[in-house]
């Protein structure tokens, strides 16, 4: 049997098997673990009472996190004229139209979020095979196809969690970074959960927020008491 590393031993010592944590306890444990060689994200998984095989129960959205994510987000915007100028003033890293499409087709993908004005979708639509697999395709359901490109840029820059329920009925999102205090994580988690409740499908029956798990990139997943997360 392979020996445990020092990090694995520290994790085993810090985590209580089968314990359901308060949000503050979970953050404290994850922040106390030995640091990785890079800045780890704090991630949330929420098990929802939905059947993602049914098209009317696919939960998808974006939540602007009040305490941010701690990450620098590079934003590309497809717009022209006044909307392009507004996007630049809002802090977009790359703004263009046909020229931006050509750049992307040439392999330039140095950005984390793509936003498009509605009239740009005739250009962006041709990039589906490039942007789609990378999760970069603009979509009105998450606010990345919008006439208010400046507002979308500001939201993306301030820190957003984007999510789509997976085949198991779970959404996953980065909710901050290791080192964030518990108050900041609580702000972000409660805002996200409130948005998820607003997105509850009308056909979803029974318990909707079934389980919440908080984890760090290299750390364990800790079950958080759903009743400890108000929204």
Swiss-Prot record:
Keywords: Repressor, Ribonucleoprotein, Ribosomal protein, RNA-binding, rRNA-binding, Translation regulation, tRNA-binding
Keyword Hydrolase among record annotations: no
InterPro entries, sorted: Ribosom_uL1_bac-type, Ribosomal_uL1, Ribosomal_uL1-like, Ribosomal_uL1/biogenesis, Ribosomal_uL1_3-a/b-sand, Ribosomal_uL1_CS
GO biological process: regulation of translation; translation
Signal peptide: none
One MF term in the entry's GO annotations: structural constituent of ribosome
GO cellular component: cytosolic large ribosomal subunit
UniProt xrefs under Pfam families: Ribosomal_L1
Function: Binds directly to 23S rRNA. The L1 stalk is quite mobile in the ribosome, and is involved in E site tRNA release.
PANTHER family recorded: 54S RIBOSOMAL PROTEIN L1, MITOCHONDRIAL, LARGE RIBOSOMAL SUBUNIT PROTEIN UL1M
NCBIfam families: rplA_bact (TIGR01169)
Subunit annotation: Part of the 50S ribosomal subunit.
Protein family according to the UniProt entry: Belongs to the universal ribosomal protein uL1 family.
Protein name (Swiss-Prot/TrEMBL): Large ribosomal subunit protein uL1
Organism whose genome encodes this protein: Acinetobacter baumannii (strain SDF)
Recorded name of the encoding gene: rplA
């Amino acid at each position: 049997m392979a020996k445990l590393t020092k990090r694995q031993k520290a994790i085993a010592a810090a985590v209580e098997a089968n314990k359901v944590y308060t949000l503050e306890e979970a953050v404290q444990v994850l922040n106390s673990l030995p640091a990785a060689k890079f800045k780890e994200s704090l991630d949330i998984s929420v098990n929802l009472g939905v059947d993602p095989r049914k098209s009317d129960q696919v939960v998808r959205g974006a939540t602007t996190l009040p305490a941010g994510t701690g990450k620098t987000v590079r934003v590309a915007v497809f717009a022209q004229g006044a909307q392009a100028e507004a996007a630049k003033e809002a802090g977009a890293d790359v703004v263009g139209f046909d020229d931006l499409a050509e750049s992307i087709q040439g392999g330039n993908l140095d950005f984390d979020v793509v936003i498009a004005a509605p009239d740009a979708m005739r250009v962006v639509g041709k990039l589906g095979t490039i942007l789609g697999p990378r999760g970069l395709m603009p979509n009105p359901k998450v606010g990345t196809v919008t006439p208010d490109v400046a507002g979308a840029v500001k939201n993306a820059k301030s820190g957003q969690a984007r999510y789509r329920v997976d085949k198991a009925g779970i959404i996953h999102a980065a909710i901050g970074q290791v080192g964030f205090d518990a108050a900041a994580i609580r702000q972000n988690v409660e805002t996200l959960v409130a948005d998820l409740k607003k997105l509850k499908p009308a056909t979803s029956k029974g318990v909707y927020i079934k389980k919440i798990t908080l984890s760090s990139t290299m750390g364990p997943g800790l079950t958080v008491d759903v009743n400890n997360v108000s929204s």
